[in-house]
Amino acid sequence: MKIGSPSSPILSVVSSSGSLDPKISGSLGSRILPATQRSSPSENLLLHRKMSSNSLRHVESMSQLPSGAGKISQLNAVVLGESLASEENDLVFPSKEFSGQALVSSPQQYMEMHKRSMDDPAAFWSDIASEFYWKQKWGDQVFSENLDVRKGPISIEWFKGGITNICYNCLDKNVEAGLGDKTAIHWEGNELGVDASLTYSELLQRVCQLANYLKDNGVKKGDAVVIYLPMLMELPIAMLACARIGAVHSVVFAGFSADSLAQRIVDCKPNVILTCNAVKRGPKTINLKAIVDAALDQSSKDGVSVGICLTYDNSLATTRENTKWQNGRDVWWQDVISQYPTSCEVEWVDAEDPLFLLYTSGSTGKPKGVLHTTGGYMIYTATTFKYAFDYKSTDVYWCTADCGWITGHSYVTYGPMLNGATVVVFEGAPNYPDPGRCWDIVDKYKVSIFYTAPTLVRSLMRDDDKFVTRHSRKSLRVLGSVGEPINPSAWRWFFNVVGDSRCPISDTWWQTETGGFMITPLPGAWPQKPGSATFPFFGVQPVIVDEKGNEIEGECSGYLCVKGSWPGAFRTLFGDHERYETTYFKPFAGYYFSGDGCSRDKDGYYWLTGRVDDVINVSGHRIGTAEVESALVLHPQCAEAAVVGIEHEVKGQGIYAFVTLLEGVPYSEELRKSLVLMVRNQIGAFAAPDRIHWAPGLPKTRSGKIMRRILRKIASRQLEELGDTSTLADPSVVDQLIALADV
């Protein structure tokens, strides 16, 4: 299916001059600002302050944080029961040596750059964009935007009219600059001793061969190509090959079930899917081709037939003989790709032409096809990577994320390669064959920048520190965290044990929808507070609003929104622009609503507090509660289900499911396992409930609405905080649920 530019004639555009008026505020107290008033966050940051106390504030709930607009009960503290770092003795300063060599070496330099990006975003981003290759430069108008549904359809455009290609800028440009012999990818297999590498010249040749195959089989500019691959080198190769010919790649995490994959195939209607026969992750072998076969059978029943299934023969995991095959549709990758030329003409595209679709969980249960375009995304990922990690040409960079998620798109593939970086790609599990595998890889490739998720940090914390300290790790100079708020104790372990108390941590906040980092420390610029994402990136104006959409200034808690557009912003939800507007721009008119809660302390540091909608963040993966509920009720013995998130010491959040069975069906451990298996099969193992709580009934209002607030309290055992239950149609249900809490 051809995917057109989101900037179609039906979307009217409200133009912006590209100028933002900064407002200087000297007030530290929380006060409400008019929703239409623009202000520069950098003007509100304090460089110096007097310490009133050396003690740490101990926060048990968000209600203990001050807010001029009243407390917002739906929000949770960063990690309940942990100290929020806010006092002088909990500030972590970069070393003088690090700051001296950093791209942004002081608070003053950061503030000057951020102020310029706010005062004149058109000039700021044009200067950066000019460092990349454009076949044709954009026109006089650098960007146009309308983020206010009251003024017309939501629309964002950056560098429209500019003609470029992101694959060319990732590969050809670097080869032409003399980096052809530089290692582009170090690939580390699941098993010890299994590895490979590609230089930028070799990577370009491999990309061109696959691109030529796709073109030869009818894939054209705007066509969707689904990629269901593990972390083989072929995954970034496939992404870049699609980008080279203007095709729109849709990478599906190779842990999603056949049903989830089929949903995505039906939505974007590709004629080609790329996969492999199997993969080994740790000691387990996963038959990916069987999952793809089942998905293609299902999508065919739903009216979408895929013509070609190009399958990589991963001989380390299985054999061809053990791979089910459908002649006429299935093609072995190695049998055909090597026959194609190693050069391929670039398809030049407009900056606003689609680059990729990436499906993310929504609160309604139907996955959302987030659509990113080419030019703005290219500039934003390259720039955020460069500054947030203080990237130098000698760095070796490793991000542990899978390319099935946005982090793998922006910070395994595009962002690093646009900077000519050497990237480590790891196929296996971080604790296989033992919990020291990560640090073995760090030493092997002399990794200097290591970017991972708090879930992995917390998991490795549980093992003896010797698994870390027996490795040198002297090459490390910058650490990074992504996917969810990192709790202060995990931050400190990461800093002290992994980084030997010398590596700054870029604790990044961003989303699939934002394309790149939005709030992040810049190593060398600011002292850090464990658990805080620190300050906004260039061109980003975060605001915290109350339930009525009023901006709150100073120390406060509330809903995190963004004022104004930025180059990396997604442009629409594929095929559903109305849902795009309803989900992200209608809750608070005039702003992009992140769906996250946030607090800001008296120094201006931002603290992300988790989702405020019906989405659970499990190990950095966003999972809609409605998706899990829909999977549970497919079980023949399940009458109804309600899912909430709970704290999990490793995953950040876990999935807690209240299940009502059909009349007369008894509770049993076998049934519990069967329900969990149903979710695994429907969505994937990562969405499996951590707890099934038997529920004779669910707490509902008289209008039939489930009171999830009460379910969250029961799940977290906060029984003294249930609040008013008198509005429930049957208040006795609550007592029944409490009685069954340990069954």
Swiss-Prot record:
Reactions performed catalytically: acetate + ATP + CoA = acetyl-CoA + AMP + diphosphate
Pfam families: ACAS_N, AMP-binding, AMP-binding_C
Transit peptide, residue positions per record: 1-84
SUPFAM superfamilies: Acetyl-CoA synthetase-like
Keywords, in A-Z order: ATP-binding, Chloroplast, Fatty acid metabolism, Glyoxysome, Ligase, Lipid metabolism, Nucleotide-binding, Peroxisome, Plastid, Transit peptide
Functional description taken from the UniProt entry: Catalyzes the production of acetyl-CoA, an activated form of acetate that can be used for lipid synthesis or for energy generation. May play a limited role in the biosynthesis of lipids.
InterPro entries, alphabetized: Ac_CoA_lig, ACAS_N, AMP-bd_C, AMP-bd_C_sf, AMP-binding_CS, AMP-dep_synth/lig_dom, ANL_N_sf
Protein name, per record: Acetyl-coenzyme A synthetase, chloroplastic/glyoxysomal
Tissue spec. comment: Expressed in leaves, flower buds and young flowers.
Organism: Arabidopsis thaliana
Main location: plastid
Cellular component, GO, one term: chloroplast
Gene that this sequence comes from: ACS
Gene Ontology MF terms: acetate-CoA ligase activity; AMP binding; ATP binding
